[in-house]
Amino acid sequence: MTIALRLSDTVSGIAVISDDGDFVCEQTFLPEIDYQLLLRQISSLISGLTANTTTGINAGPPANASPSTALGLCVSDLRYASNGSVTSAVFPFLDDKPLMRDLQAATGLTSAIGNDAQCLGLGARQHDNETLFSLVIDKDLSGAIIMNGKLVKGRNNHAGQITHTPLPFPVPFELDGSVCSCGRTGCLTHFISLPGIEKDYKQLTNTDKSADNIIADATKGDIIADSVIQVLEDRIARALAPVINLLDPDHIIISGQAADKNRLPAILPRKWPGYIVADKPTTEITIITDRHVPCLNGAASLVLQKT
């Protein structure tokens, strides 16, 4: 039995998932925005949710947690530091906190944490024998690698994290020297993200508009908004080209508000031949429009890998 929990700026939720992968129960919640309050909230949610199941598991106070129960946590835009602490662009109060250590102390449960891309890749994989790359495009950009059904973390816990790698094959107007939040220039997240969409639109129109509205206008045929999205799609193709050349994944999963399920699967393969070694790429592309449930499933898979 696994408890899966997701912290997101869109939908946060918790679920009890059986060993067979079935959702025993699930609920959404509004996360606290204070670190200690959040830890207590998570402990309380676990106690309440497990006590109300018919499985006989009673997490109760931390000391009474069942040894067969474990906690997997998915946090949007999560990053890891070498000292075991984390950061999150969505939840800045988590910055520099030893989240996994404190979770285990607060809940009494063996715990594992991952970001949306990592949990999405684990939760949405179709075959355990495939190599998969997952990409999440939202306020930030994150990536992850899944091989043989398991998350590849890497020596520094950053495998697949292409966020702050340079945009491949840049054209002159993209080399404007704009500085990323990390202090470098030319980072992928600077171009492939919701703030990146807004920046491109403002450069064209000198008008501020939310990424939500730009994406909506593009679907309605607005020429300027559509041109911004076309540039984004070309950048996604370029960002994935080195991934294909190096990893050659069987499957690429993309999620996020800017990931159009009707456009990207057709557009990306047409752009890749100019950037990759394979002359006729057969990489499978899947767009996940709602990643909440896959991320919960992935959080459960993440902790099972640890245990």
Predicted regions and their residues:
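Short beta-strand segments
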Residues: R6, G72-S76, G114, F133-D140, ...
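Residue-level detector of high-confidence beta-strand sites
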Residues: E26-T28, A89, L122, G154
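Hydrophobic "anchor" residues
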Residues: D22-F23, V86, L151-V152
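ATP-binding/phosphotransfer module of carbohydrate and carboxylate kinases, centering on a glycine-rich
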Residues: M1-T69, A81-N83, R101-G108, Q126-N129, ...
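Short, active-site-adjacent cap segments at secondary-structure transitions
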Residues: D77-A81, C119-G121, S142-G143, V152, ...
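A charged helix-plus-loop insertion that forms the helical arch/lid used to bind
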Residues: G84-D95
